[in-house]
Amino acid sequence: MRRALSLLLFALAALVGCSANVTPALGQVMLVLATDMTPGRDFDTIAVRVADPALSSELFYDWRFRAVGGGRFEGDLSLPATVAIVRQSQGTGAVTSIRVEARLAGVPRVVREARVVIPTSGVQMLRMSLDWICWDMVPAGTIGAANALACADGLACAGGECAANSADSEALATWDEAMVFGDGRASTRGDACFQVLGCFVGGFSVTPILDRQGLCSFSFDGDPERLNVAVALPVAAQRGFCAQDACLVPLDKGEASGWRAESGRVVVPRRLCTDGRQLAFSNACAPKTAAQPPCAEWSSVGLTPAANSDAVTLGLSPASAGP
């Protein structure tokens, strides 16, 4: 089931079955929570903090995830999920600070921050995905993250880089359920989600290279409309979606944390080159986008994976990154 959560007048309260067809009188920013990792294993808590100058204290809520054995996980929340941050009726339009953390054993491992102005009317969408590319890259002063890379004050990780945490409220997209929950229908259709392992079986592995312009990329002369790219991690890492011979973290086409095709090359986040990461790519499926979340038992969109991941062997063949 999808879970939509409302911060009505900045008080966190649960809602069930929130519909995109209902337009509130007051403006909202619809916060979208998503991930390319596996809740319950890669992180066990999602924490949301909202601070508004009109309030004397910070408002917050935590959701827990846990392993229950046999490779299965349970949680307080299905992902992707939405949190409606509603403008106060007497609000001044001041900047609202939003912070989302993915924690593991109490340690913040992925932290996203944004500063936005809640609109006077209508519903805008703010996507804050908890992506593996931002693992252990947190804002300076984050409590409990002593071993992480620190972004300077006013900066937070986005696409593996420290970037300004202020969002242009006027540039935020209008809320559209289909851009979060696949086809926007009830969670009974497998094509609303992305079969991570199934789409990479028989694919290729490649190590991207960093060019003089600072772009991290690899050569690709195929059809980008049939391309998918993922970070390929050792099975021992147990991050993302794991088969017998590799774990994959899928990258979304067109996102800062994902990939784009450019002049016969595929450009990916720079951090993947500086960290010496290996990639997997395949032309078996249409490209995964942010609107098509992974298929998983914790998903609010699609069905559980069709095949038992323990029985899947990707069999990736080495490819050249090109000149």
PLM feature spans:
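Signals and flexible motifs at protein termini associated with secretion
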Residues: 1-323
